[in-house]
Amino acid sequence: MEVIAFVGSSGSGKSHRAIGVAHQYHCDAIIDDGLLIQGSKILGGTSAKSEQNRVQAVKRAIFYEDSHAAEVREALARSSIRRILIIATSDRMINKITARLVLPDPLKTIYITDIASKQEIKKAHESRLRYGKHIVPVPTVELKQHFSGFFANLPYNIFSKNKNERRESRSIVRPAFSYYGTILISDYVIEDIVNQADGGIRD
């Protein structure tokens, strides 16, 4: 199985662009925030956006729990996936995910700054800060089985000027950990959590 990495800061619009990047690089599936997604189906995993706090969400996204990692490894083994897109906030986070899922190093790494303008990234960050909304690259009807938070699914692309542009392959959600104000966790803190998790994980 081959791996393509997609890296960008938290809230920069990675999940919004994930399906397009996956198609461009001929990826059969996506790993995003603890979920293994193929087409419009979730093959395995648990969404990090279902966690009650941001620290637990980061641990979920890197498959910190052995049972979570094992479930997704088994789902990968049962699948016919040949190339997979892994989404993360840093190269180190990519490495941790591939280690936990026993996947090879990425053939290529795409950075959000390679495919999105500074203005587009700023707009995505502002949307995250203002509304606390997150995008999951899977239809709402499928995600409802795996997510218990608030759904704010819109019938159009919030990043497009064309309100007639439908995005039925994505869901817009508000995780439980974003209900209570706008407490933020920076990418530096995410990196610290990933680093500290090394001590509790056996690759």
Regions found by a protein language model. Give the residues of each.
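Glycine-rich phosphate-binding P-loop
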Residues: E2-A22
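Short amphipathic alpha-helical segments
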Residues: G13, R17, M93, S186-I193
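Conserved residues at beta->alpha junctions
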Residues: G8, I87-T89, I185
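Signal for well-folded cores of large energy- and translation-related assemblies
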Residues: H26, A77, V102, V194, ...
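C-terminal accessory "lid"/substrate-recognition subdomains
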Residues: I110-R202
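Conserved nucleotide-sensing/catalytic segment adjacent to the nucleotide-binding pocket
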Residues: D28-L85
